[in-house]
């Protein structure tokens, strides 16, 4: 193992002590290459932390096949905005993992105002088929024509709590994503308070 690899592993191990729970890669907007994903998978394995991969769309079969081959533990579909997109994601998961004994945890991203407005029908569609919903705050504030630093605002907190509440009703996990930094700690504490009540 090279020095950079070892440094990355040590940083992740340190981060785990303060709450890091996974390493994320994206085929979607980051355009992660397979060689990069393989290296990240090695680092994650050495640091004993799971991987999360955001695929390129609701029906990104090639991405799902790659995730299946690598036994990626968590998969997120981006920009889910309608019941139909949710349906296509569920169908794609069934097509790739239907006969497989290995099943990853699966999530959708609600990261636009349109997706938020269609939350009820989307959550109805995925309940029982997908594990949860991720609130993608950076793209969400962009869809509202707000600045990136609005991710921790009261408006976004209220919308996140609405998604969290709907997830609880439909027995889905709720995850806050996008713009996670030290500045997000008060926001996350508020989410946790309500989620644990």
Regions found by a protein language model. Name each.
Residues 1-197:
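Expand to "…catalyze enediolate/carbanion chemistry for C-C bond making/breaking, isomerization
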